[in-house]
Amino acid sequence: MRNILKATTLENKFPLFTVENGCIVSKDADITVAFRVELPELFTVTAAEYEAIHSAWNKAVKVLPDYSIVHKQDWFIKENYAPDIQKDDLSFLSRSFERHFNERPFLNHTCYLFLTKTTKERSRMQSNFSTLCRGFLVPKEIKNKETVTKFLEAVGQFESIMNDSGFITLTRLNSDEITGTRETAGIVEKYFSLSQTDTTTLKDISLGADEMKIGDNILCLHTLSDAEDMPGKVGTDTRYEKLSTDRSDCRLSFASPVGVLLSCNHIYNQYIFIDDHTENLKQFEKMARNMHSLSKYSRTNQINKSWIEEYLNETHSQGLISVRCHCNIMAWSDDRDELKHIKNDVGSQLALMECKPRHNTTDTPTLFWAGIPGNQADFPAEESFYTFIEQALCLFTEETNYKSSLSPFGIKMVDRVTGKPLHIDISDLPMKKGIITNRNKFILGPSGSGKSFFTNHMVRQYYEQNAHVLLVDTGNSYLGLCEMINRKTHGEDGIYFTYTTENPIAFNPFYVEDGVFDIEKKESIKTLILTLWKRDDEAPTRAEEVALSNAVSSYIELITKDSSVTPCFNTFYEYVKTDYREHLQEKNVREKDFDIDNFLNVLEPYYKGGEYDYLLNSDKELDLLHKRFIVFELDNIKDHKILFPITTIIIMEVFISKMRKLKGIRKLILIEEAWKAIASANMADYIKYLYKTVRKYFGEAIVVTQEVEDIISSPIVKESIINNSDCKILLDQRKYLNKFDSIQNLLGLTDKERSQVLSINLANHPGRKYKEVWIGLGGTQSAVYATEVSLEEYYTYTTEETEKMELFALSEKLGGNLELAIKRLAESKRNPEK
């Protein structure tokens, strides 16, 4: 059947002439430079930072010559998550995680910026002179080379100003990225197919009287093209109520409702037209005079005259530049019913900005045509309104979705808005960029906030990326994960130590494999003995410190020279009792300066025959060097004032010796509530030494706590742990809302970070099961992520007693196959009717 509608080819009407040196040249000799724009992540920008971004745009726009066009084009495309399950080395839990998010829909954001130099004549053209309506085009010669050179210099300045702002990155597109190659589509091709994928299909474009179609997609256009449609007041940013509280403020850009918060396929076009400012003002002066002379005939003329005069007064008094502006939201769908919903959604989002929603059907083709990269000068002048640069820039969207880290190492978290999995590196990349100076982490989350879930999720992924993980726990939080690793590796890994009187954890502090005692090792021995000798609240005198230091040094000298002396606590005790006592007498050290009998008496329980003689005289070292996942469970002794701190130090010593021997391998020690055992004044130097050593040997020390009171009341925590942890991780703090000022001061959080922390779990998606977590790096980079996991991971990490019992009972029935038990249990919960 013959097509009765008038048809033509795209080639016939195509408005672009060529692309040279990364510049798009139109058939009317307009020159356009294209950029890819990287915006800050959602919910990570404060009001002051939005002001700074606005100021940078303002400075940049002002360097462009007259008759330039700034066109920012934001693409928001619905996509589905494609899981990466083809890798052979994926673990059972990683594969479960990927499957859980299979086909998860999310909104992908891509942002472009086009800077166009046109002419006075072109900037005044209306829609009836669009290249769409003209029969043929004749390429013009660009006669004035100086104009082009000056424009390109201004573009270079524009790029520098924006990139120097520290918030936005502009990357200039090359010719291949504009026109495409045989393998990948360019931005022009992508525009005509309403897609951002590298492989696109060009579709027929249908321009009807009341609708426009591209392939099967019907376009729905809303425009902001009249000052009357605008709100009475615009700003750089606005308060996002869903994530704000009476004590915190979550900010988004003024135009965010039509950006990432509008969850449908759409393009948000923002145009600023820079005309001749002086000529604009002359026109307005003339218009004001005309209105004045006609004011007797109509009150409207009198009102219009006063509006024009107010605009002129503002221009002269504030030194503002007159420009034209236009914004439009181009949404589409191949389903007419869905399109009705989209139309309502766009209208609602515009109303949130206090703009008057205007559904435009007449100008859709010409506005679509003007949005072609490089064809900005074809914009119909009647669709723009006069304003100032500052106000026009408030209509720019200034944020994007969360991004994955470009790093091979990292952990999988989830975007709190879209639910898309993200790969984030909170250790290596921030270190490389200088955002942090150490990899240590401090985690704070009250009971029930999802803390152990997050730590399980994190250490599991560290382990799978070949890190050595050592955990000190007091609540069986890691039993499921450890047991699973143990069974998977047939006992080679996943070692679970529980402190019992029959099988206590013991070691030898004086044992060094290579026989070399460096300063750090000597310091750790001194700290250990000091902990045994003095109570937490009993600080040693300077004389006592010197005497202890000399005792340790001279004993070490003895054992390195005399191989007949077995290095252990027993021989150290005997040495102090005999040789060192004589040494003190020779030096006339007074008893009040160092009471050696008191020292020996206090340490006697650790000497042979004493109550704790097994603790420091082990004849065998804990052989944990090649075990990659170890858990020490100290729940049985967490209230024991002697055993708890000593055992914790022993474990830390084991970790340090592991660190020294394993070169170039990531090591991680995570201390749960056991940190309280070492948070005494006498331990301060030891903790500082531990943190210093950890950094030196490619390690990470992670301290986890749930009690705010503990950290507020302990100066040692602040000085030794928090100050040496550049990564802070906080979970839901609403429980401590009234105490949050002291937490903020203690952790050194900025107001921006405070707002982010207090937004945790305020607007969780009802259809997804997850808890949110805030991760702050070095006080400069921070965001809130979701810890969402598959059911398989859930049953591995769960700390619920009933769920654990159900899992282990099923595992026993299946002959101890924990992985199969997890699979079966997860499947039964997913499909309960089977």
Q: Predicted segment positions?
A:
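P-loop NTPase motor domains
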Residues: P40, A47, E51-V63, S263, ...
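Short secondary-structure boundary/capping segments
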Residues: I85-L90, S127-L132, G374-A377, M484-T489, ...
